[in-house]
Amino acid sequence: GHVPCGKDGRKCGYHTHCCNCCLSGICKPSTSLIGCSTSSFT
């Protein structure tokens, strides 16, 4: 299921400890400073 994450609380299809939602279903670690990851976190 989707979980809320990121500053704006957008829902994301993947979950990881401290994640930011960029585009739908795309997450990146909150420590990442460069754009969004193209990989999915489970």
Swiss-Prot record:
Q: Tell me, in one coarse class, where this protein mainly resides.
A: secreted
Give me the disulphide-bonded residues.
5-19, 12-22, 18-27, 21-36
| UniProt note on tissues of expression | Expressed by the venom duct.
One GO cellular component term of this record is: extracellular region
- Molecular function (Gene Ontology), one example: toxin activity
Q: Which Pfam families match?
A: Toxin_19 (PF08088)
Which range is the signal sequence, renumbered to this chain?
A: none
Which superkingdom does the taxonomy of this entry point to? Eukaryota
Where is this gene product found? Answer: Secreted
Which UniProt keywords are listed?
Disulfide bond, Ion channel impairing toxin, Neurotoxin, Secreted, Toxin, Voltage-gated sodium channel impairing toxin
- What does the entry's free-text domain comment contain? The cysteine framework is XI (C-C-CC-CC-C-C).
According to its UniProt entry, the function of this protein is described as: Iota-conotoxins bind to voltage-gated sodium channels (Nav) and act as agonists by shifting the voltage-dependence of activation to more hyperpolarized levels. Produces general excitatory symptoms.
Give the family per the record.
Answer: Belongs to the conotoxin I1 superfamily.
Q: What is this protein called?
A: Iota-conotoxin-like R11.16
Record organism: Conus radiatus
